[in-house]
Amino acid sequence: MFDWDAFMLARIQFAFTVSFHIIFPSITIGLASYLAVLEGCYLKTRNPVYKQLYLFWSKIFAVNFGMGVVSGLVMAFQFGTNWSGFSEFAGSITGPLLTYEVMTAFFLEAGFLGVMLFGWNKVGPRLHFFATCMVALGTFMSTFWILASNSWMQTPQGYIIENGVVVPTDWLAVIFNPSFPYRLAHMAIAAFITSALLVVATGAWHALKGKRDAAVNKMLSMGLGLLIVLVPLQVLVGDMHGLNTLKYQPAKIAAVEGHFKNEGNEPTPLILFGIPDMEAEETKYKVEIPALGSLILTHSLDKQVPALTEFAKEDRPNSTIVFWSFRIMAGLGMLMLLLALWGNWLRRGQRWGNKPLFLRFAVLMGPSGLVAVLAGWFTTEVGRQPWVVYGVQRTVDAVSGHGVLPMTISLAVFIVIYCSVFGVGTYYLIHMLKKGPDDALPPETTDMIAASGHVNVA
């Protein structure tokens, strides 16, 4: 049925493991900062609702963090097992960057995570708050180093090639490569949006079940307040990222747009929908808006976007995949904006309690951030092909020399283990989210909240 060689199986295996892994950091990055905000608000106001939410979401964070660490370690091993050609060629750059992540971010998280999770009643409130902030900083620093490495693979600079391997000459240029600032901002905002959607969906779920206490209202209010700021900001950052990609990876943009040929000097249309055909070099059944592609991508009606046929066939990314992955990401972004606008309109007077249609929509949008992150990752990585280091090393030259049989067996083992272990972990997470924040507190603390007059306060 499938005539895949070892190279394709290695790509599928890496895509599978990374797709699993990226889910967990996308949640923990935002949740860590959310926990820091909750604890800071509690220390300032002494409103026990903030403590209630902190203790609840810290459990969600802990499970996500654990699964993220495990899946990340497995992914890192594949650089040596399946992609030894890449490790030999570019290891002098990617190796130190990953080491910096371990020496800074991971050590910071590991050093303070225990205090954060188990030290609420064992250390002073300021020290505990400091530990939470350090964990949040650690998650962001991890994002910094990982994206520095990945961005260098997208827009490499600050190196020379000696004896067939990469040698760094300017570490600042390596780290702060042309695409890094945009990709870091885009991913960080995406992680915060993903966490906000999860918080909103959890609050909406419990509101639908008839639970309308202060914790539920606070989750909805804080999550929607963050979304109304971050979703429009993400649109702006995404536009800037697109312009950067057009400058340094024009073939990727042409593939994303499904744009195969320019017509004379006419401005480039925006293809909304269609079916890209790489063999026929056209997008079939397309629905397009004239000139809008030029306006969005060049901010001008006089310029054209490079077409895919302007690049050699062996240098073209697969338009069929990135065309639709980008539209999934963008379409979900529009739905997120709708949720943010609708929710903040209802936020005045907390009118979402009697709006079951909105609450159901919010629950359905809960996992949309994760789907959008995955779609964006596919757009970025598939759009980089056929290069592993853009314009420098081809992916086919980076793979190890394994045969089809061992790659097939290892892929099957990964699928079974990942689906089993992370399936159970995900089931446990959903179970905790359904139980709600009240279960994170002992009965006497819940009684204290009711007696404090904060039950109906958002």
Segments from the language model and where they lie:
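Polytopic transmembrane helical bundles with strong interfacial aromatic enrichment
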Residues: 1-458
